[in-house]
Amino acid sequence: MVQGLPGEFEDYLYRVIASLYRYAERLVVVDYPSSPTRRSIDLIVSLPGSRVVLIKAIYDASLISKKEVEELSAVANSLGVSAVIIAERMGREDLLTGVVYDRYGVNMVNLETFENFVSGREEVYVTRYKDIYTVSISSEKLREKRLEKGLSLGHLAYMLKTSRKSIYEYERGVMSPSVEKAEKLVDILGEEILEPIDILTSPRKPVSKRDFDKPEEALVGEKLLELGFKVSHAKRTVVDLVAGRSGEEGVGSRIMIVVKRSREGRERMMSRIMKGVKMGSILSSSLYAVVNREEKSLIKDIDYTKTIVKDVREFINDVSRGRVEENEE
């Protein structure tokens, strides 16, 4: 059940959900907070090939702020999963099918493009960053084909009416050609130089989010950082802290933590915990409720959610000893 969405937001989210059910091995809807424009994550999807994706789905992407997108990216990065925005418009402009847009460092595509990608029907080669369209090419193939043709950097640059430095940067993989230049390169060197874009790989390095709200969050977050975890603080989704160890799998490699928020009552915290359990099941993440000793009585009957409840000192002692528990099934 998706709650609290105005009509057009609800319609589009259900459309995305209906589409992804055809391709996903598992799918979890994250309907917290209730406002779709304040929520960083709408869906968590497990795709074939063991690829897990955090998705923000909104018809008009201009309605979500940089803060929501940066949190989406940071949470995905800490957990070692992918992040994608699915939208149809950016203000008055329709998103083009077959184009990957860079929205604050997260790949953004329309639903048709995402369907084509996950189904394998059609590969994507064009990226738009700000107002510039570029084409993805293989730097290695470009160099290989240029040498096969017996072309120097200068000669190829002359044929493209560009600089020698630009060709050099293409071959280093630090710059991509415009659509016009890419078409000329394909005419000269062949389609083998094109390289499909992996929509599930972020175009830029994610920004870490560690602006902790409470002393408990800071204590827990700093200890996890000290132990080698990537840590992000979240304000616009169910959990408050996420942490993961790069390249590791299994128990203890991913942790999500719910911390009691200011003026948050028992029912609201329990609701977040139950939603967090669903998130953890698809992310293969342990879920902790970290509280102070006085707050333990607030959630004393939490056992039915299979959540691990610790006060701050207990949690820090456990993770310091490498003891990260797994939620019961």
From Swiss-Prot:
DNA-binding residues (ranges): 153-172
UniProt cross-references to Gene3D superfamilies, sorted A to Z: lambda repressor-like DNA-binding domains
Species: Aeropyrum pernix (strain ATCC 700893 / DSM 11879 / JCM 9820 / NBRC 100138 / K1)
Keywords tagged on the record: DNA-binding, Transcription, Transcription regulation
Pfam families with a match to the protein in the record: HTH_3 (PF01381)
UniProt name for this protein: Putative HTH-type transcriptional regulatory protein APE_0778
InterPro entries tied to this protein: Arc_TR_HTH, Cro/C1-type_HTH, Lambda_DNA-bd_dom_sf
MF terms in GO: DNA binding; DNA-binding transcription factor activity
The organism's place on the tree of life at top rank: Archaea
Cleavable signal peptide: none
Domain HTH cro/C1-type: 142-200
